[in-house]
UniProtKB/Swiss-Prot annotation:
The chain crosses the membrane at residues 14-34, 53-73, 110-130, 185-205, 238-258. Belongs to the TMEM19 family. It is a multi-pass membrane protein. The keyword Membrane applies. PANTHER family: TRANSMEMBRANE PROTEIN 19. This is Uncharacterized membrane protein sll0875. GO terms for cellular component: membrane; plasma membrane. It is found in: Cell membrane. Keywords: Cell membrane, Membrane, Transmembrane, Transmembrane helix. Its main location: membrane.
Amino acid sequence: MDNSLLSEIWRQSLAFPWLSAVILNSFLLALAAIAPKKLLTPWGYGHAWVLGVIIWAALGWRGYLVVLAYFFVGSAVTRIGQKEKEAAGIAEKRSGQRGPENVWGSALTAALCALAIAFGPEPWQLWLALGYVASFSTKLSDTTASEVGKAYGKNTFLITTLQPVPRGTEGAVSVEGTLAGFAAGLALAVLGYGVGLISFGGIIFSTLAAFIATNLESVIGATLQNKWPWLTNEVVNGINTFLGAAIAIGIEATAQLI
């Protein structure tokens, strides 16, 4: 295939973003269906297709690369120390395969930011792009902190009381998990800057928001999650990513006023 044809295909994809999004994600879904290693459940793949269409059509390859990075890195860290976590009864269900509830618990905030960028007022787009990156930075930070903490945390304590608790306890944190989570959130923010979705300052805002939101999520887990049956891990994840996006936007808005 020569360069002129590739250029024409690329121009057409930009001219018809929703159509190209459907074609691209259908192709990737077909590849996933025949891949020997399944990272999602069958329904999870269907919902991921919807998410992928939204992200590609609204944000193009830049936004798509961010969500792919979150998905593959998040799936990889979930499998860290898998056998040990399964033996202790603290591993993710379905051996880490994600279902629809996981897809939207992790990405609903990002999808709404992407749709708002595509259809909302132009003055909001820079803030919404920051919210998009920060939501995934937050979720990757949370996932990494949790999985590394469960696998390698030497001392695990409840965030609200600092009392020692077993690994995998809701609201538990560890030094190892916290540091790994911070690094993961920073890495995702750097990627967002690298593809041009956020400014250099956005790296700081996104990383700081991810750190704050991840710890707030631990507080929710320690204080409320066991009291309210409807407050599932997926609902908490949705709250977590919303907080990450909102905090990042709030920090940037405050910085602009100073």
